[in-house]
Structures are given as structure tokens and as C-alpha cells.
From Swiss-Prot:
Protein name: Meiosis-specific protein ASY2
Family annotation (Pfam families): HORMA
InterPro entries registered for this protein in UniProt: HORMA_dom (IPR003511), HORMA_dom_sf (IPR036570), HORMA_MeioticProgression (IPR051294)
HORMA domain location: 10-248
UniProt biased composition (Acidic residues): 257-266
Coiled coil: 1205-1246
Localization of this protein: Chromosome; Nucleus
Length: 1399
């Protein structure tokens, strides 16, 4: 671990970007924005923290990654970014659900220290405040404090990790875990994520990073909050040059206060307020009334609650389906109804201290413990037990958070002991037995669980104990409660499942009576655990109202989970099923659901390990899984795989090849061409893309247990044992590079460019180099390390490849996955590949018990010599959860052919799969043989073939024990078991060869020099790299099949090396024979019976004889019989050959005869192989003839087509001319179109000008007309005023005077008339009358009256100047009408009246 005190600007930028990316990706994971399979586990070994990394699985995930890496990082690198706001909305148009604000500030000062301050403060929805900080001594944490270590690495590392875990979970508990039930609802609905960037003022206005654009004010105002959000300030990280501050806003209610339970143990019901998450779905909820008062502060003097700060909250007792009802009014009405009811004031557990909550939970636990009794039903019993245990755990978590212990894991561990005692009390009450039995026997935590530091490990250990304890008491809840004192019979597993499984409509066949019944639940914990797994879903289903549904009904709802495209285990199906029902909030109390969410979070990964796919169903812990003889368990690290080299920009210089290069079905005609379909690489290309051979870098730290010791054991492999393995698998002529792990190296931390392998892969499983592409593709698809496979899995790979190659097929990975399943074994980290029941291509007994195979491992460099595909399947670190195989509805196209070919193979049992058979079929037949003349010259015997012994049956040990180094254990370097020559020395020419260990040892000693020449290169003090180079070109490698003499009892072990004792298995020393020799029995050794009989009969011909062999060995292995048979093989005319027993060179002749017969046997095998391939070639010739006929027909058709093509070419020329003319016309039309476009544009310009001119003229005429109308109106008004003045003058002034004058004149005329008629009037009166008339006339004449002209009297519009043209006026006969008739009538009436008066 590197201690860092100062960071440069580049390191500061990297730290800030990594923190930002981790925050965004973990928020996406916690809130369920993407499916779980889109995230990859990452870890920080220095801090023991696990994170989630979003992988580009689809367009949406790639888009979010592009926003971060190309957009946000660009602005951050240029120091333009001020704030990054990450929104989570319900829909595209809002409203907002959560808002994460990341603020950035930049500094060029190097004087600051790298610090992290986690201080959670916030304001809730109702105005209250919340705080969650560490002590003053640990509130701020520098990078040195996080990374520095001293000599006591284990203790300080655990304390530092526990502190970091506490800091992380203090944030998690105060905000995220309280919202955990809301996180799962995100997965069932679609959410919209938005990202907004704010820049500093100095940033250019036109700057926009990739994937981002400018935002208008209308768009910003579009997204609003549905209610007042909760505001929280998480803290800040100062990395010297960059300061990152995090704030959160959310409308999700983080508070989930628990209601006090009644004394009668009624179920807790959860109230639903107007701001609940489920208000968008109308439902009917019934709860008991309650009051909750959230306070911001208290009066310190009087201790009373401030009435102004109170907010009364009551549950909605019933929400009807009527959506028109105002929820606010409904809530206020409920407030009025509850005002008169007594209620207790409950303080919020997060706003106030935790002490009240702890006291409350203590009282609740006392009530639970007091009311625990034998349940009436299994549902009630499990509910009460689970409520009590979950409340106890929640209480301990809150107590540990309140006390702020330095190591939170120890506090939780101590709480688990109290949980154990509490559970024991419950169980003792349920079973009427002492509590000590269950406290000591069934709830003991394994020490391995203590190695996981922090709260996560403690909850994980508690979850494991919960399942084990549930398995032990599972049978209690199905026993009915009776008052009888008689002992209750134990319920078997079959009766348990029958009672818990709902009745089915289909009749079930009764099980045969011959099958024995299963043991009671208390006998097998694993079986009872499986029963509990089937019980819990049924209990939860009945708890949610699904009483008539079973687990199968839940599992069939696959359409709901097709969105995730993953295989869900039963527990995950049940949880997601519960999330679909809104009543789940009412079925469990708040504390129960809180712990249930934690258990689901941390217990899901543990449960998935033991669940695999078998016949499209999920099962747990099958009984036929491969077991291991390991006595110690290992902690599996979860690390990241790294490339060998990095190119520019951090990209891989050696990208991995496609996983499955055999995408199509590929039948093989010749086995030698089998591997031509894979990509070919040159040695220079591979060396350029991989690390250099001399470069060895151990970049992975070993896993340390709780007592600071490296887990697992050091390897027992040595350079000699690895050389023996290479020679055994026929790789002596390949320049392989291997490394023996040192004291601190284990299978999961090899150096870069190396992978770990076990010797059992090659000794017992017959694997070879280079590693086949099938295994590499399988590991690449599963993201597993090579060393995670068990030898049983390698056996299935080797058998599938061998059987397929015998029939001319190369098995690809897709077909292999359809025939097999991947399953975890009991040893953590190891996985076995088993055949499916319907596709069991390897029948018979399986070799599943490889003794101590995991103790012999070594590292091999990945190159062309060790891997067929050196750029794939190079994962070094182990993974806890390999990628599962997701079967498609249809099988691959080539599956049927490959499956039939494998099942056509002969001798498909594992004992028939031998090393010689594998070498011969997979193209590794030995090509050099020993000369028999070497034995005649008294030369050292040649090496014998290295072949495996026959595999044992019925669970016996493997053919050879793994070799170990010489030392205290005293185990032989070669360690092959001795085989009795008289009982087991048989050889099958087809491939089932068994060679005595004596010859194998001699062959090993001779081949240790001839086959390989190791070159040791010292790398460190305790490890070395061994390169096994090829022998010189001039030397011939003697790897023939000649067998040494077996009659001599020679010891194989070298001086100072002893064999492993097998007395514990009753097998004696080096496989002692049950038969005694003749000398030991006191008999004459020469009297041994003959194994053959030679008879010539009555024939005189020397080459006509009958040879009958009755020995237990094969003829080619019996030297005496072979020599007598060989001596009778003579040419015509030759003399009889002497008896071989009388020869001087008897032994030499016997060896020669035996070698000759072996050569003949090999020739027979060679001819048979040639005949088989020749038949294939003949079949190919027939196919070639058919192909030739087809080719001739194709040529004729081609000639006919050429003739037709000539005519078509002529037509094409004509069409070309037409096309040319049409192109010219198109050009002319295009030019005309351009002219018209120009003319159109000109006309548009002219139209605009005309419109402007028309508007100007219209305005001018309108103004002129308005002025003229104004003038005309003024003129008419003036005339009218003059006429009015005239009329008034006439009426007021002129009229009276004129009337006086008229009266005077009338009087004068009347007097004149009277005087003419004889009347006498005085002269004075006449003169006075005249004077009066004259005076009146003078007055009238003296008047100056207004005179009206014709223009003044004419009021016509024509005279006023506001008239239309004459042509526009229609002629009218009497325009103004006439009153002649009226006047005439008036005149007649006046005249009549005058006449009457006159008369």
C-alpha cells in the first residue's frame, strides 16, 4: 500500500473523476435505473470496499457512459464545470424525484492536504433538521490516515476498513437504507434521468461539451418538484487541486416510524399519508389512527413542545376509488375526527437522539418475548419468530450507530451472540426443550464469517445463521397445537412438503413403497434448508393474500421479469413478487421490512451460489456434485482482471478474440485440418501483444485471513513434478514457460501474463498443451479463471473433445453449454461442469474424489505454446459469481449433429478414456520409435511410453497420487502406484493401455534428460521460472512404445525418497499383490505353468501350426509366448529355429520378439486408421464427382447466360444513349428551372415593392379622404349654424315687427273697405292708423336681417363637395319625395272654411 501525502494536478483530476463516476454508477445501481446484470463488481483492495461499474450493455447505458466520459470529463478537465446536477424523474416531462448536485471548485495551491469530510446535514419535508456525523476526532479523514499502515498490518487494516465501512454505512443508514423499499419500486417502472451542467462566468458562451447543448429558461422551468423535497449535504472531498461537494434533494420519505404494538400482538399496519409514493394508484387502506408530531426544537426552559412548530399527521383510513375527491380536504376531515382521540407524541428517530428508539425497541422485544408461545399455524409461528429476530437485529444496528464504536463489525458480532441467545429462548419455548441445546448446536457462527469487516460482513454472517437456524426449527411450525400429553411423532420431509403445498388439480402417482422414506428434518441440515426455502415463499404468499398460490405459480410469472433478462432464484422471485403488490407495506412492520431488505441485499449473493439450472428449473445442492477433500476453506478475493499491456489512452494493446470462433457447424473430413479454422498468429505477433518472457510482475496481493496469515496452503509442486507433467501430456517438444509459486503465491494471484493450473488436470484428466479452444471459450464466456475448474470439469471437457474428434466433429462451446451445467461445489470458488441428465455423454462411474489435487499447482505463461487462443480466457483472479448460461428457446444449428456424433463414439466410460487414446485422437500420436538393435548391443533400455493406469471404480483413488516435493511428508517425486504385472498388465491396442509404474519411473528418469531441458531463470529469492525448450534438431526423442522387462522386481524410488503409505485405506505399500511368488510359497520357480500351447498336428510343413495363448497378459506383453510365436515365423526353405529357451541371448530375443509384435500391432492400428480415412476419402471422391457434375452444369448455364448477356449488353448500349439524351434534357430543364427560380425571385422582389407602394398610396388616400370629410363637415356645420341663426332672427326679431306691420296695413285696408261701404270713421283715427302703419313699416325697413343665398340653403352632399360621381348615382324620379297631395287637401279644407264663414 502506497502512502500518498501530496497529489499533482493530474492525480487530483483522476481522483475526482473516479469519485464522480463511482457516485453516478452506484446511484444508478441503488435506484434500479438499469438491470442488475448491467453492473460489474469492482473492489478497492486498499480500503476493502466494493463498488458497481456500469457496463455498456445497451444504448441507454452507453449513452450515460458517454455523457460522463466525453461530456462531463471534458468540462472538468478544462476547469469549466461548476456544478453537475443529476436528476431522476418519473417521466420525460417530470416531476422530479431526486436531485444530486456535485459542485466543483479548483485551486492551484499545493499546500492543502487531501481530506474527506462526511457530514450529513439536511432539512426534511416538514421543516425539521437532521444530522449524522462522526466524532470530532474522526469527522475529517486524510488520505494518509486511509492509506498508511504499520508493521501490524492485519489489526490496523481491519480498523481502517471498519472505519471506512462505518463512514460509508453512516451515510447509507441515515438516508439510503431508509429508502430501500423505494429502491425496488424503481426496478418495476421506467424512470427518466437528466443531467445538467453549470459553468463559471469566464467560460466562453459558445462552449458546449460533447452530448450537451444549451438550455432555455422554459426547459429549466419544466421540471418541478411535486412537493417540498428533503435537502441533504453529504460532504466534500478535497484533493488539493479539486474540491468536490455533494448535495442531495429527494421527495422520497426517508422516515418510516414504527407504531407501538398492542399487547394482544396484532399485526403492525403501516399508514399511508397524502405524500406517499403510492398515491398515484387508488387503493383502499385500513389502519389504526395515530399521531406523529415532528418538532424542530424544544423549549429548553419548560420542556414543552412549541405549538407553532407542530404538524399533526394522521393516516388516511380509507381512500376511495373516486378520484374527484380532494385529498387535502379528506386529510383535514380526518384530522378533525382524530382531535378528540387520545394519542401519544412520538419523536422522529432521526431528527432526535436514538436513545428513545432504543428504549422503545427494548420494550417491544420484551413484549414479543413475553407473548412467544407455540403457534397455531406455521404462518403465525414464522411471522412471530421473524419479527422478533429482525427487531433484535435492528435494535443492535441502531445501538451500534449511536455508540459510534471504532470497529462496527465487533459491535454487530456481539449483537449476533445476543440474537443467538434470544433465538434459543424462542426455540426452547416452541419445542419445550432447554435453550442451551440450540444455543450451542445450531447457531454457532463460523470463524470464516469474521473475515469480512464492517457491517456488511456481520449482516452476512447473521443471514447465514438465520438460514441454518430456520432449517433446524422448520419442522416445528407444521405440528398442530393439541392439549394431549402424548409425544408428537416427527414429521418427515415428504409430509412437510405435502402439508405446505396447495392441492393440485392433476392426480399424482403414489411413490413406490420400496423407496425408503427420507430422514427427519433434524438429520440433514442442507435438506432442511432446502425445505425452508420452499416454505418461506408459501408463507410470504399467504401473508400477502395469495393463500391459494404456490411457489410454482410465482415461478411461472416469467413475463414480469423478462425485462431483466436474468435467471432469478426463488428468493428473488418472491421479493419482486411482493414488490408488485402494494399491500406488502401493510403486511410487514417497518422494522421487519427494514431487515428484510438488508437480508435480501446481502443474502442474495450467498443464495445464488447454490442454485444452478437443471432441466430449465432451479435446484439447490444436488447430491451428485463433485466433492473435495479439502480440510480448510479459502476466502475468494473479488479483484479485477488486467491486460498484459496498455496502449495509448489506456486501451488494451491486445484485445481479446471473439469468444466462439466456431460460429457455424464445421464437420471435419480430416482430423489434421481440425484446427485450421481458428485464427492463426505468428510468434512475433504474439510476443508484440503480450508481455515479454523475462518480465514477471506480481501485482496482486495475497488474501489475508483474520489472523494475518495467507489463506490456503503453499503449493507442493516442484520443478521435477512439473517436468513430469509436461512429459506425460506429450509436451516435451514445446517450449513452455512455467513458474513454481512462492511462499505468498496462491492460485488466485499469479503474475501478469500467467495462469494457474493444477497437476491433476494432466495426470488424472489427460489434458494436453496447448489448452483447447473449447475450454478457453468456456472460461471467457463465464469470466472465470482457469484454476476455478475442478478436475471433474476437465474430465468432461476432455471426453467431449475426444468423442467428437473420433467421429470427425469439433465440439464448440455453444453445443457444450447445451449438454452441461455449471455448478459450485462446497469449497468456495471452485466450480464443476456436469452433464445434463438427458445429455450424459460420459456414463458409468465418475471419478469425483481427486485426493489433495488443489495442493499441486503451478503457473504457466500464456502464449502460442500453452494456449490455442493466447488472447482469450486469460483471467487470473477468481470470481465469486460467474456469468450464468442463459439458454435460448432454440438449440444451435449444429447441436443435433454434434450430439449424435458424440453418442456414436465407442467406449464412452471414463475408464476407457486413456492418455494414449486422447493423444492418438487429438492428433498427438508419437512419431518416433526405438530401434530393437539397441537391446542386442547391451545398451541401456529405451524409455517406455508414459501412459496412465486404468481409472479406479466405485470412488477409489485416482491412478496416481499427485507428486509432492521431498521433505517431511516423505512422498515420492514420481508417486505412481505400483501395478501387479500378473494381474493388471494388459494393453488394449485401441487405446486402453496400462503400463507398469516400474517402466514409467524408468521412462521418467530417462526422459528427464531427453524430452525436456529446463532452463532455470531466477526471478526472486523463493521462486524461479523454468523454460522447457525443445531438444536439438539432431537428437531423436525416443518416445516409442517398447516396454521393459517386467520379470525383474526393481524398485522405483530413488535413495532417500520413500513412498506414501496407504495403510489407512487398507491397500498396503506400493500396491502389493495378493498372490505370493513361487519362491515365497516354497515351490520350484521353473514349474510355473505355460501361458501358451503350440501344436503342429500331422502336417509336415513347418509354417503350419496352431498357437493357443491363455495368459492373463496381452500377447505382446508376454515375452516368452511372444518369442515362441516369433520363432515359428519362417521363410520357405529355412531350417527350424532353435527353441528360444535354449538361446544364449534368450532375453534379448524375447525383447526383440516382443518389440516386433508391438510393431506389428502398431502397423495393424496404422492400417486400420488408414483404411478408415481412405474410406472417408473415397466418400469424398464420390462427393467430388457429384460436385464435378454440378460444375459442368454450372459451366453450361454460364455459357447460356453469357449469350443472354451479349444481347443485354446491346440493349444496355441503347439504353445508355437514351440515358445520355435524357440526361441532356434533365440538364436543360435544370437550367430552365434555375431561370424560373431567378425570375420568380425577381417577381417576388417586385411584388414586395408593389405592396409597399400600395400601402403608401392607401395611407395617403385615407388621410386625404379623412381631411376632406373633416372640411366638408365643417362647411356643412357652418351653413347649418347660419340657417339656425337666420331662423332664430326671423322668429325673435323680424317676425313680431313684420306681424305688427301686417296688422297695421290690414287695419288700414279694413278701414278703407268699411269707408267704401258707407261707414264713417273719424279723420283723427285714420291719421293715427296711418301713423301707426308708417311707424311699423319704418321699423321693418330699419331691420338688418341675415340674408341666405342659394348656397346657404342647399345642404346636398354635392354642394358640400362630398358627393359621388354622376355616373355612380342612379337616376331617381322624385329624389326627395312630394307633399303636393297633403298641401292640396289642406288648401281645400281652408278654402271650404273660408267659404262657410263668408256665407
Amino acid at each position: 500500500m502506497v502512502v500518498v501525502s501530496k497529489n499533482n494536478e493530474q492525480q487530483s483530476l483522476i481522483l475526482t473523476t473516479e469519485l464522480l463516476r463511482t457516485a453516478i454508477f452506484n446511484i444508478s445501481y441503488i435506484r434500479g435505473l438499469f438491470p442488475v446484470r448491467y453492473f460489474k463488481d469492482m473492489s478497492v483492495p486498499a480500503l476493502d470496499l466494493k463498488m458497481k461499474k456500469l457496463m455498456p450493455m445497451d444504448a441507454e447505458s452507453r449513452r450515460l457512459i458517454g455523457w460522463m466520459e466525453k461530456g462531463v470529463y471534458d468540462a472538468l478537465h478544462k476547469k469549466h464545470l461548476k456544478k453537475l446536477i443529476f436528476y431522476i424523474c418519473e417521466t420525460v416531462d417530470g416531476p422530479l424525484i431526486e436531485e444530486y448536485i456535485f459542485s466543483f471548485s479548483y485551486s492551484d495551491s499545493d499546500s492543502q492536504d487531501v481530506r474527506m469530510n462526511i457530514n450529513i446535514t439536511g432539512i426534511n419535508t416538514y421543516g425539521g433538521t437532521l444530522n449524522s456525523t462522526a466524532d470530532n476526532s474522526t469527522a475529517d479523514m486524510t488520505l494518509n490516515q486511509m492509506s498508511s499502515v504499520d508493521e501490524d498490518f492485519g489489526q490496523n487494516a481491519r480498523r481502517s476498513n471498519a472505519f471506512v465501512t462505518y463512514q460509508r454505512f453512516s451515510v447509507y443508514i441515515s438516508f439510503h437504507i431508509a429508502n430501500y423499499r423505494l429502491c425496488y419500486f424503481f426496478a418495476s417502472v421506467q424512470r427518466t434521468i437528466l443531467m445538467k451542467l453549470l459553468y463559471y462566468e469566464y467560460v466562453p458562451p459558445d462552449y458546449q461539451p460533447p452530448f450537451f447543448r444549451g438550455c432555455s429558461e422554459e426547459e429549466e422551468a419544466q421540471y418541478v418538484w411535486p412537493k417540498i423535497p428533503l435537502r441533504m449535504e453529504i460532504g466534500n472531498v478535497n484533493s488539493q487541486h479539486h474540491v468536490l461537494t455533494v448535495k442531495v434533494k429527494s421527495v422520497l420519505d426517508p422516515y418510516d416510524p414504527c407504531e407501538d404494538e398492542n399487547d394482544n400482538m396484532q399485526d403492525d399496519e403501516r399508514s399511508k399519508g397524502p405524500d406517499s409514493l403510492h398515491d398515484d394508484q387508488p387503493c383502499k387502506v385500513f389502519t389504526k389512527p395515530s399521531k406523529l408530531i415532528l418538532t424542530e426544537n424544544k423549549d429548553a426552559d419548560h420542556g414543552e413542545v412549541n405549538e407553532e412548530k407542530l404538524l399533526l399527521i394522521t393516516p388516511i383510513c380509507e381512500i376511495l376509488q373516486d378520484v374527484k375527491q380532494d385529498q387535502v380536504e379528506h386529510q383535514l376531515a380526518k384530522v378533525k375526527d382524530t382531535k378528540g382521540r387520545p394519542a401519544s407524541i412520538v419523536q422522529n428517530p432521526i431528527l432526535q437522539s436514538h436513545e428513545y428508539d432504543i428504549r422503545r425497541l427494548k420494550a417491544r422485544l420484551q413484549r414479543l418475548e413475553r407473548h412467544i408461545s407455540v403457534p397455531d399455524s406455521p404462518q403465525e409461528g414464522i411471522r412471530k419468530w421473524f419479527a422478533a429476530v429482525s427487531s433484535q437485529l435492528f435494535y443492535k444496528v441502531m445501538e451500534a450507530c449511536t455508540r459510534r464504536k471504532p470497529i462496527l463489525g465487533d459491535a454487530i458480532l456481539s449483537s449476533t451472540v445476543k440474537v443467538q441467545n434470544f433465538n434459543a429462548k424462542i426455540c426452547s419455548k416452541l419445542l419445550k426443550k432447554p435453550a442451551s441445546i440450540y444455543r450451542k448446536k445450531h447457531f454457532t457462527l463460523n470463524s470464516a464469517s469474521l473475515r469480512i469487516s464492517g457491517l456488511a460482513g456481520s449482516i452476512f454472517a447473521w443471514a447465514v445463521g438465520f438460514c441454518l437456524f430456520s432449517a433446524q426449527i422448520g419442522h416445528v411450525f407444521v405440528q398442530p397445537k393439541t392439549r394431549s400429553s402424548e409425544s408428537k411423532p416427527k414429521v418427515t420431509m415428504e409430509e412437510l412438503e405435502e402439508k405446505l403445498t396447495p392441492p393440485s388439480s392433476e392426480p399424482k402417482s403414489a411413490p413406490p413403497s420400496s423407496e425408503p422414506k427420507s430422514a427427519p428434518p433434524s438429520s440433514e441440515p442442507l435438506e432442511k434448508l432446502a425445505v425452508i426455502r420452499r416454505i418461506l415463499p408459501e408463507i410470504f404468499a399467504q401473508r400477502c393474500g395469495q393463500r391459494n398460490s404456490s411457489f410454482e405459480a410465482f415461478a411461472q410469472r416469467r413475463t414480469t421479469y423478462d425485462y431483466y433478462n436474468i435467471r432469478l432464484n426463488p428468493r428473488e422471485i418472491i421479493f419482486r413478487r411482493l414488490q408488485e403488490e402494494s399491500k406488502v407495506a401493510l403486511a410487514l412492520s417497518s422494522a421487519n421490512y427494514f431487515v428484510l431488505s438488508i437480508l435480501y441485499r446481502f443474502f442474495r449473493q450467498w443464495s445464488e451460489v447454490s442454485l444452478v439450472r437443471r432441466n430449465s428449473r432451479l435446484t439447490g445442492n444436488p447430491s451428485n456434485e463433485a466433492q473435495s477433500s479439502r480440510s480448510n476453506r479459502i476466502e475468494i478475493p473479488t479483484l479485477l482482471d488486467e491486460p498484459d499491456r496498455e496502449g495509448s489512452g489506456g486501451h488494451l494493446a491486445a484485445p481479446e478474440d471473439p469468444v466462439d470462433f466456431l460460429a457455424q457447424f464445421d464437420p471435419l473430413i480430416d482430423l489434421e485440418d481440425a484446427y485450421n479454422t481458428q485464427p492463426q498468429y505468428t510468434e512475433a505477433e504474439v510476443n508484440a501483444r503480450l508481455l515479454h518472457e523475462d518480465h514477471v510482475e506480481f501485482d496482486l496481493v495475497p488474501v489475508v485471513s483474520w489472523n494475518t496469515e495467507i489463506t490456503a496452503k503453499k503449493t507442493l509442486s516442484t520443478t521435477e513434478s512439473v517436468a513430469e507433467v509436461f512429459a506425460l501430456c506429450g509436451s516435451g517438444d514445446r517450449p513452455l514457460t512455467c513458474m513454481i509459486p512462492g511462499e505468498n503465491e496462491r492460485p488466485w494471484n499469479p503474475p501478469r501474463g500467467y495462469v494457474c493450473m493444477y497437476e491433476a488436470y494432466f495426470r488424472q484428466c489427460h489434458l494436453w498443451f496447448p489448452i483447447p479452444s473449447l475450454i478457453i471459450s468456456f472460461l471467457n464466456r463465464r469470466h472465470m479463471a482457469f484454476s476455478q475448474l475442478t478436475p471433474a470439469a476437465i474430465c468432461n471437457f476432455v471426453a467431449a473433445l475426444t468423442f467428437g474428434a473420433e467421429e470427425g466433429y469439433l465440439v464448440n462451446v455453444r453445443c457444450f453449454e447445451e449438454m452441461t451445467t455449471l455448478k459450485a461445489i462446497r469449497s468456495p470458488g471452485y466450480w464443476v461442469v456436469n452433464n445434463r441428465p438427458k445429455h450424459n455423454f460420459l456414463p458409468g462411474p465418475k471419478v469425483s474424489n481427486f485426493k489433495n489435487w488443489e495442493e499441486y499447482y503451478f503457473y504457466v505463461r500464456v502464449d502460442l505454446e500453452s494456449y490455442e487462443r493466447p488472447f482469450s480466457g486469460r483471467k487470473r483472479m477468481w470470481t465469486e459469481f460467474p456469468d450464468r448460461y442463459r439458454p435460448s428457446p432454440d438449440f444451435p444449428v449444429e447441436f443435433e449433429g454434434v450430439l449424435e456424433a458424440i453418442f456414436r463414439a465407442r467406449r464412452r466410460t471414463w475408464k476407457d478414456v486413456t492418455r494414449s487414446r486422447v493423444n492418438r485422437i487429438m492428433g498427438k500420436v508419437r512419431k518416433s520409435f526405438i530401434s530393437f538393435a539397441a537391446g542386442l548391443l547391451n545398451m541401456p533400455p529405451p524409455p517406455a511410453p508414459i501412459e496412465e493406469e486404468r481409472q479406479p471404480l466405485d470412488g477409489e483413488a485416482a491412478a496416481s497420487n499427485p507428486p509432492v516435493s521431498a521433505g517431511p511428508s516423505g512422498v515420492d517425486q514420481v508417486s505412481h502406484e505400483m501395478v501387479n504385472p500378473e494381474s493388471q498388465d494388459r494393453m488394449c491396442l485401441e487405446g486402453a493401455d496400462v503400463v507398469p509404474a516400474q517402466e514409467i519411473a524408468e521412462c521418467d528418469r530417462s526422459q528427464s534428460v531427453q524430452v525436456v531441458e529446463p532452463e532455470v531463470q531466477n526471478i526472486t529469492d523463493d521462486r524461479s521460472v523454468v523454460v522447457y525448450a525443445a531438444p536439438p534438431a539432431g537428437e531423436e526423442v525416443n518416445t516409442g512404445l517398447t516396454i521393459l522387462d517386467q520379470d525383474k522386481d526393481e524398485t522405483v524410488a530413488e535413495p532417500g525418497i520413500s513412498r506414501r503409505s496407504r495403510e489407512e485405506k487398507g491397500k498396503g505399500g506400493a500396491n502389493q499383490s495378493k498372490k505370493r511368488s513361487a519362491s515365497e510359497a516354497g515351490l520350484d520357480e521353473a514349474a510355473a505353468p505355460k501361458t501358451f500351447r503350440l501344436s503342429r498336428g500331422e502336417t509336415l510343413n513347418s509354417d503350419q501350426f496352431t498357437f493357443k495363448y491363455s495368459g492373463e497378459k496381452f500377447l505382446v506383453r508376454d515375452q516368452e509366448a511372444a518369442s515362441h510365436l516369433w520363432r515359428n515365423l519362417m521363410l520357405p526353405g529355412t531350417k527350424d529355429f532353435p527353441n528360444p529357451d535354449d538361446l544364449v541371448l534368450k532375453e534379448g530375443y524375447q525383447k526383440f520378439a516382443r518389440s516386433s509384435l508391438e510393431t506389428a500391432a502398431l502397423a495393424n492400428d496404422l492400417i486400420a486408421t488408414y483404411d478408415r480415412k481412405l474410406k472417408l476419402k473415397l466418400a469424398d471422391r464420390e462427393a467430388f464427382d457429384n460436385l464435378k457434375k454440378c460444375a459442368d452444369q454450372a459451366k453450361a448455364i454460364y455459357a447460356k447466360d453469357m449469350k443472354e448477356m451479349a444481347s443485354l449488353r446491346d440493349a444496355a448500349e441503347i439504353h445508355k444513349a437514351e440515358m445520355s439524351s435524357l440526361n441532356d434534357e434533365v440538364k436543360r430543364l435544370n437550367s430552365r428551372e434555375a431561370d424560373l427560380q431567378k425570375e420568380f425571385s425577381d417577381l417576388q422582389v417586385a411584388l414586395v415593392a408593389v405592396k409597399e407602394h400600395g400601402e403608401r398610396e392607401c395611407n395617403r388616400l385615407r388621410n386625404d379622404r379623412a381631411a376632406k370629410v373633416a372640411r366638408t363637415t365643417k362647411k356643412a356645420q357652418a351653413r347649418l349654424d347660419r340657417v339656425k341663426a337666420y331662423l332664430k332672427e326671423q322668429e325673435d326679431l323680424v317676425g313680431p315687427k313684420v306681424d305688427a306691420e301686417n296688422q297695421a296695413r290690414g287695419a288700414e285696408e279694413i278701414v278703407g273697405i268699411l269707408m267704401q261701404r258707407g261707414a264713417k270713421i273719424a279723420a283723427s283715427e285714420l291719421s293715427g292708423l296711418k301713423e301707426l302703419t308708417k311707424r311699423a313699416t319704418d321699423e321693418v325697413n330699419a331691420l338688418n336681417v341675415i340674408e341666405l343665398g342659394d348656397d346657404d340653403l342647399n345642404m346636398s352632399p354635392d354642394q358640400l363637395g362630398f358627393s359621388r360621381q354622376i355616373s355612380q348615382v342612379a337616376p331617381v324620379a322624385d329624389q326627395h319625395g312630394s307633399n303636393v297631395d297633403l298641401l292640396a287637401e289642406v288648401i281645400r279644407r281652408v278654402s271650404v272654411e273660408e267659404t262657410n264663414q263668408t256665407t
